[in-house]
Amino acid sequence: RGLGDVYKRQDVSNIASAFATYSDKFNVKKICVGRDCRLSSERIFNALTDKLIDYGLSIFDVGIVTTPVLYFSLFTMDVDGGIMITASHNPPDYNGFKASIGKNVLSSNQIQELKILIRKKDYIIPTEKGSIEKIYMIDNDIDDLNKRISISKKIRVGIDCANTPIGLFVNKVFKKLGCESYILFEEPDGNFPNHHPDPSIESNLSSLKDLVLEKKLDIG
């Protein structure tokens, strides 16, 4: 991870080239790529996928999603890996990559191997063009959750989306589970105008606490 503006197009191209080279050893041909709503994510996504296509990879664009939705796609689609463009709970000017081969996230040692490839520019030579296709995974993920989780009584729940991608579908999740939901900061916004999306900082929970108390909710 690093500052999003630090990832110039050539830097992202080098990361894509290193991933394509390293994953070629594992016969990776098809991958899912997702991104969060940070201001730099779309630009990084375009640079990354353009280069991966140059290396012959078939890309399934799962859109603006949470990291768990990207991981869900690895287990439910016929793909060989995936990349999530995100900086998780870091400030809005940060961004980064979470890469997987098969169903496993790259280890720290594997990431160091990518770093060596980038330093040496020791990339495979592309032989054919790949492709890109948009895929909508969120409804499949919600249906899977609904099959796995059952709630015996109606729960009144408050959710603070912190202007992150979860706001795109969280209401659907709880509605299908039969919950009564009250949602804060639902609209994805890479500026995170209401608060930093880090729930480990107690001050970021103040609006949610107020909501739970005001509405007398069961949980938040």
Outline where the language-model segments fall.
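Residue-level detector of alpha-helical secondary structure
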Residues: N14-T21, A47, K51
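Short, highly selective alpha-helical patches that border small-molecule cofactor pockets
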Residues: V12, A16, S41, F45, ...
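Glycine-rich phosphate/diphosphate-binding loops that line cofactor/substrate pockets in enzymes
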Residues: A16-I31, R148-S152
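Gly/Ser/Thr-enriched, mixed-charge loops and adjacent short helices
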Residues: N95-L217
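N-terminal small/polar loop signature for handling phosphorylated ligands or for N-terminal nucleophile
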Residues: V28-Y94, V173-G220
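Well-ordered alpha-helical segments embedded in enzymatic catalytic cores
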Residues: D11-A18, V69, D141-D144, N204-S207
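Short, small-residue-biased leader/transition segments that mark boundaries at the very start
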Residues: G2-Y7
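A conditional alpha-helix N-cap/helix-loop micro-motif detector
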Residues: V12-S13, G63, I138, I201
